[in-house]
């Protein structure tokens, strides 16, 4: 499975640096000098490999220099490009109750009372914490519920069973 670790926002300056929106929990490791990332152009076209020459933090994003990208025009051509890695390349997580987003996406969600809520469509990362975007199309009318990914609400996660159990406070599931 492919995981997006960054997206090129725009060129920065005239020497070929790019501004990258971070989409990984470990940007220092992913964008370390010498690393090679797969780049998927936003406008179609073939994937290419990009070697990181340098990366530094800048306003919550990264300024990245890639091998072979030496001017603003070449950097501008990368706008919208996604940097991806294969999920098989990710290290195992040793911390309990810690997951990669792709492990949670697709899991079924139900309440402790057995009521089906839907399936995790996406994990949203906000300043206040993570939210599970849970979608359900069972009744013909699609609905989405945002569930805070906190231990007070998420009581159990079973990757083996493909299930997340929640104990929602009153009103959380009401539309």
Swiss-Prot record:
It holds the Pfam family PRC_RimM. Its main location: cytoplasm. GO terms for biological process: ribosomal small subunit biogenesis; rRNA processing. Keywords: Chaperone, Cytoplasm, Ribosome biogenesis, rRNA processing. It is found in: Cytoplasm. It comes from the Bacteria. Gene3D superfamilies: PRC-barrel domain (2.30.30.240), RimM (2.40.30.60). One of its GO terms (molecular function) is ribosome binding. SUPFAM superfamilies: PRC-barrel domain, Translation proteins. One of its GO terms (cellular component) is cytoplasm. HAMAP family: Ribosome_mat_RimM (MF_00014). An accessory protein needed during the final step in the assembly of 30S ribosomal subunit, possibly for assembly of the head region. Essential for efficient processing of 16S rRNA. May be needed both before and after RbfA during the maturation of 16S rRNA. It has affinity for free ribosomal 30S subunits but not for 70S ribosomes. Belongs to the RimM family. This is Ribosome maturation factor RimM.
């Amino acid at each position: 499975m492919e995981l997006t670790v960054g997206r090129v926002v725009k060129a920065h300056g005239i020497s070929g640096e790019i501004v990258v929106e971070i989409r990984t929990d470990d940007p220092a490791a992913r964008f370390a000098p010498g690393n090679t990332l797969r780049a998927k152009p936003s406008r179609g076209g073939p994937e290419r490999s990009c070697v990181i020459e340098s990366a530094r933090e800048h306003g919550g994003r990264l300024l990245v220099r890639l091998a072979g990208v030496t001017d603003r025009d070449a950097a501008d051509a990368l706008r919208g490009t996604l940097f991806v890695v294969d999920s098989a390349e990710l290290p195992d997580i040793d911390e309990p109750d810690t997951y990669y987003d792709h492990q949670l996406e697709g899991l079924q969600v139900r309440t402790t009372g057995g009521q089906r809520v839907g399936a995790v469509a996406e994990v949203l990362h906000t300043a206040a914490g993570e939210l599970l975007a849970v979608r359900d199309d069972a009744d013909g009318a699609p609905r989405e519920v945002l569930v805070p990914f906190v231990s007070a609400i998420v009581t159990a996660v079973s990757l083996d069973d493909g299930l997340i159990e929640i104990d929602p406070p009153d009103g959380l599931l009401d539309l």
